[in-house]
A protein has these predicted regions:
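Positively charged n-region of N-terminal signal peptides that target proteins for export
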Residues: 1-5
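N-terminal signal peptide c-region/cleavage motif recognized by signal peptidases
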Residues: 14-16
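Extracellular/periplasmic metallocenter environments
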Residues: 21-27, 34, 74-109
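Structural beta-strand segments of beta-rich domains
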Residues: 38, 46-50
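Beta-strand-rich interaction surfaces with strong enrichment in secreted/lumenal proteins
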Residues: 38-40, 68-72
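Short beta-strand/loop motifs in extracellular/secreted proteins, especially
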Residues: 48, 58-60, 102-104
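Asparagine-centered strand-capping/turn motif at beta-strand->loop junctions
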Residues: 52-54
């Protein structure tokens, strides 16, 4: 009986942690002052890990007012940006240093 109670309590407390720790990973590349891909579709209500690789020799800043995120990625370097869970919708982002070409959108479905 005592083992059953302990096992039940362990499962009750372990399950929410395992669920909230899950995240989906996506890759974004900066090349020729553009984001590739320009559109990323992600699941709604999940934490997102965005791995950004800057293949340009100059820095770029990933910025999104809707995601409340900004991150400078030096030329030739990588960065990881976490956000979410997101409600269904569109979340535009842009490159602060090259706004005319570095644009994209994350779509949560």
């Amino acid at each position: 009986m005592r083992i059953n109670v302990i096992a039940t309590l362990a499962l009750m407390f372990a399950s929410p942690v395992a669920i909230t720790a899950e995240s989906s990973s996506y890759e974004l590349t900066i090349k020729n002052h553009r984001f590739e891909p320009q559109q990323i579709t992600v699941p709604a209500d999940k934490k997102i890990k965005l791995m950004v690789t800057n293949q340009d020799s100059t820095p770029e800043e990933f910025e999104s007012y809707e995601l409340n995120r900004e991150k400078i990625i030096p030329g030739g370097k990588k960065a990881v940006i976490y956000f979410g869970p997101l409600k269904p919708g569109k979340y535009p982002f842009f490159g602060e240093f090259h706004q005319e070409t570095a644009k994209g959108v994350i779509i949560a479905e």
